[in-house]
Amino acid sequence: MGHFVVQGDLPWILCSLRLVIMIIAGKVSPTSSDALFSVPVPSATSSPPEVYLPATFKLSNTQLAFFLQENRAPSYGSQRGHPLQRSESFVVFQTKELPAVNISLGPFTQDQTLSKDLLQPSSPLDIPGRLTVNWKVRAFIVQSRVYASNPLVQVLFYIAGRDWDDFKIQDKLPCVRLHAFRDVREIKTSCRLQGNLAQCLAQLDLPSTWFNVNVAPLGRRKSSGTDGLELTGETLQVELYYTLHDPDSNDECGESYPRRGGPSRGESLSQQPLLRIGSISLYQPSQEQLVVDKQLDKNLFLRLPERPLKPGETLNIYLLLVPNSTVEQFTLKVKAKKGVNLLSTKSRSNQWRVEWDMQSGAKHSIATVEASKIKGVSGDMAGSIEIMQLDFEMENFTSQSVTRRINWNIDYRGQNPTSDAEKVVTELTVVQKDIQAIIPLSMDTEIINTAVLTGRTVAIPVKVVSIELNGAVTDVSSSVQCKSFNEDIVKVSMNCDYVFVNGKETRGSMNARVIFSYEHLSAPLELTVWVPKLPLKVELSDNRLSFIKGWRVPILPDRRTARDSDDDDDDDRKVSRGCTLQYQRAQIKVLTQFHTTSSEGTNQMITMLGPDWQVDVTELVQDSLKVVDGRVAELADRTVLVANELGSSTLKVESPLAVEAVLGETQFSVVDEKVSIVELRVHAISGLALNLQPSPGNSHTMVAKATGLQTLSTLKQEASFSIWVYYSDNTAAPLSMYDPKDYNLNGTSADDKVVTVAQQPQQRWPVIIAEGEGTGDIVHVEMTISETCQKTKRKSVIASSSVFVKVRFGTDEDSEEDMEMETEIDTRMPANTRRPAIDSNVGGAGYEPSNEQPASVPIDYTNFPTISNPEEPTEEDEEDDEFVHSPRSMTDLEIGMYALLGVFCLAILVFLINCIVFVLKYRHKRIPPEGQANMDHSHHWVFLGNGEPLRTQSDLSPQTVESPSNTLEGVQTCCHGDHHSSGSSQTSVQSQVHGRGDGSSGGSTKDHGEDASSPTSKRKRVKFTTFTLPTEDLPYNSIPIANEEDIQWVCQDMGFQDQEELHDYMRRIKEIA
């Protein structure tokens, strides 16, 4: 009876549960039936693909400039990109004019020139109307030691980084003021930068008071070397600084060459900061000239001046005896080359007698000097004794300088101690001019070695000038010799006119040296050499390329036939009409850092621009990019990786100089997997805006920010598209990366009064033309398979999307306001994609397609338009053109709701199974209509009525002890009444009683003599008993009665008092059934 109540209320229960499930699902699911897949929530384990405005950036009017990329990765969860914006950092190293940044996207281009203030924030070399971004003033001290006998300070200034062929601004160069400080005293002078080298020599005469008595006199050098002086006591230091200032009204510096220092009258103090040059040492002059000693043997040595000689000058050379020597006589032979004449020889000691004889030849002159000690004359044996003085004359010559040699030989005439057999040679330098020093000047002080990447030599011109005592500056570049200190860092040309790198260098240096020599003088040229860090960092936008489901492309002759699959089980791979599935493509970017070693010799690496920046060198090495296995992939447009067939390979950057040398590489694979297009994001672009600004935190770098505009402000104005394709493997790529021959892009307008869509012959994609004002998702774009790959029954649409369009005509002021608003990006752009089906075999990480709003604007996922699906595909189309959706991670709320929903579904399923089992059992227990011969099972019938029963109670049921579960006894116990119904139905009952399946009637076990434990006795334990009404025309009904407890529950629950009430209740049950 209870089962009937549940069965009758089952539809109401199912409807209630259904309503509850729909309400719960509506709270956690989007309103659109497809939005659950099209707008997933952000995943906690994967970030969305980075998108940007796919515009092309270029730098022009530069000699050396790079785009940059920051090493610092964006913080987790931050907005990684915007499809209508793109920012690129860049740096300009060398330029002759103001650089310009160009951006282009489709038919739109935008150029902007960098302002001088942006490129050159502040510089003391600022010249009105001229660009001096690379200019640097360099200063060289001619002599670091100044003697009181010649207290002249000379400093050479020149501008490095300036083009030496630029003669237009020589008259606009500034003045340089030299400051000399000793304690609190200061003197200064000025000179004007001029000439093609933009150089000048500043000279200062130091006051004699600066050379005080505290300075120790010079000592003599006892060694024959020329490395330096052995000075006694401490020396005084003078600090040198410089400032820049403009010329006066007379185009002069005001302090041409003031001797004895001091500012000019009426001159104001310099407002420029003092820039340090270095320091010089002051020395008190001695009574003797600066000389050098040259040892002849263990007994005798020569003393001669160290300075260069002038033509016609007389040279005095002294011969001395070492202390405690026992030599008493010797013969000195002097052999001099042509140009050096021995004028005279005289004794310098009263202890020695000197005689000499001269013999002149064509090439040489030989003098023989006899020296003997005078007996009886005593002297100081503890000190050195000057024996004689030899005077030589330097003849005139025509060259700039010459070197004269004199050979010395001592003969003791057989007396002890014996003489040394080796001859001693002294070299004398004779110069036409009194040159103080030579100074190498390079046009720039730094070399960025891009030759390692390109194979093209990078060279810097070099000039060498000589500085004379009188202040003359002479170019001696054609007469110098040169040599690189380390050719693994920098090299120098054979003519010494430039230094260069050719790509074979292995390292850099902060002080790379090239030595230049001129006559007896030499000087180093110091440079900073930057080299790229190897291996290069080769980046791919996607290093795992897969098939794109549903996108078929023609097999061109240059495409690999291996892409054609013969697998008949995979219909999407089967090729018909010469077509195959498209592969994903990847964008290539090559990055590096330029670095050098420190000047301290510790091999500490110093990175150009700091460790936070990487330099984009893709344009430099794009000709050296190569795929190792060309069958797997190839390059398109030199920077796009195109897959050809399955496999793994390496993309490498080959060295342009060394065979089989690799500068950098990265691995990639073309896998036998399929990804689907989960979103086609399309934006209408009506123009481009470009903004240039300095990079925050770095004064050398700048940022170019491009923004795509959306508003159409004039009639017939055209707009193009910016399209990104999102894949189910959590990657995205601009559609412009793919060949336009591999797809068709069609656009339609929902309102031709606002915009129309037309295909221009010169344009890759359709264009939007403004016809009237309006806003909304007016344009619908479909991406279809190329015509050669379409099938007659195959749906060719790969993906589709609605495009947000805004047309507003107005004045120029309104347009400027729109530009400002569009710079902040319109957040109402939709992203719709056609997705016919879901393939559970292809999966990937979740992504966040709607990443278009700024961080401060929340995203309303429920406002996305419904998915465009204009026609229902056939079963064959769905099977062939099936799309894949990317599984995504769910939030905790969704996991909980879906778990609860699953429990409800499981409970409903269990309930339905229980009902089905019950119905099946119930149908098997029905009594067939009258006339049916037999039944499969025997039943015991309980008669309710006023007539006599067919059998007695003992015949209808077994004894209680034999069958405790006797059904009739259960009725007696429950109802406490007679076993007769209120109607006369004896005949009817008798006609409805049938025998058992074995042919016997339903009697007790006693009548048949069966044992209670026999298998047949179990057939008497009937669960259901059927009662029939007296009229045979009425349909029969059955009453299920389970056991005694069930019957007691039904009787007590219904509260029947007599048999009439029970009969009425049974009639109602029949009507309900």
UniProtKB/Swiss-Prot annotation:
Native source species: Danio rerio (Zebrafish)
Signal peptide: 1-33
Protein name according to UniProt: Transmembrane protein 132E
Record membrane topology: Single-pass type I membrane protein
Main location: membrane
TM spans (from-to): 900-920
PANTHER family assigned to the protein according to its UniProt record, in alphabetical order: DETONATOR, ISOFORM E (PTHR13388), TRANSMEMBRANE PROTEIN 132E (PTHR13388:SF7)
Alphabetized UniProt keyword annotations: Glycoprotein, Membrane, Signal, Transmembrane, Transmembrane helix
Cytoplasmic face of the membrane: 921-1073
Glycosylation sites: 102, 324, 396, 746
Top-rank taxon, per record: Eukaryota
Gene: tmem132e
Example of a GO biological process term: detection of mechanical stimulus involved in sensory perception of sound
Biased composition (Low complexity): 982-994
Classification via InterPro entries: Ig_TMEM132_2nd, Ig_TMEM132_5th, Ig_TMEM132_6th, TMEM132, TMEM132_3rd, TMEM132_C, TMEM132_M, TMEM132_N
Pfam family, one: Ig_TMEM132_6th
